[in-house]
Amino acid sequence: LMAIRVLVTFVVFALWAVSATADPYAALSRLEGAELKSAVSAIAARGHRPLSYRELWEVLKDADQDPSRSGHVVGIYSRTAIPAHCTEGKAPASCDQKWNREHVWPKSKAFPRRDQWAHTDAHHVAAELVRCNSLRGNLDLAVGGEHIPECASRRGKGASATWEPSDAAKGQVARMLMYVAVRYEGDPIGDRTPNLELVQRSTRDGEPNLGNLCVLLRWGQAFPVTQQERDRHAAVARHQGNRNPFVDRPDLAQRIWGKECRVP
């Protein structure tokens, strides 16, 4: 009897070990649309350790470091190399430029509190020049607007203003936002964040939505994952514990949202 118990214990442990190391995406091959989105959400949440807002400074100094200039971070939109010590609020007088923590999915839509996990999620919070962060504000993503050279982006005017990052940033920004849209499905694991959705319209401050889904889907398809994006992803995963499935498997985006946008 003891031998049988030992054998059963060994088999259970072996199966657990295999499942723990298996490709988490292998079981998704037959899923599409909403079912696939739900399954990808579970993968995106796996291992997530919420960061403090203070921790984000050091995480971004690592994740957004400039590989060609030691001691600098690279802005998510501007692609400007900024001295890492020139942080907003603590930068010495010698700093000509300052950077802060840009929420690519604006925190005013809809996770303004620091105890909400999306507020400190480094998979979509990135280094950026203070001015470019301010100019982006809470704008939806779309094509068009006045070119802002220092931010390498375009910004519209008026109530329906939008933000268009440069081609160098479009794919990465799209995959960051897709991650947020699947990761946060209405607090299933106590992350204190509402269900966040990408939509095909302009959005208002305070609502848990961001536009424009179909523009982002096109950007994600047109601008593939770069080595810089892979390196950033790996750094965030080391600190935070979870992964962005759209960096690992960019094809998932079309399988989740392609029919909504008629993108092949």
Residues covered by each model-derived region:
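A generic structural signal for short, solvent-exposed coil/turn residues
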Residues: 14, 67-68, 93, 238
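N-terminal module-boundary/linker segments of secreted carbohydrate-active enzymes
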Residues: 20-81, 255-264
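Short, His- and charge-rich active-site/binding loops that engage polyanionic ligands
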Residues: 73-75, 80-98
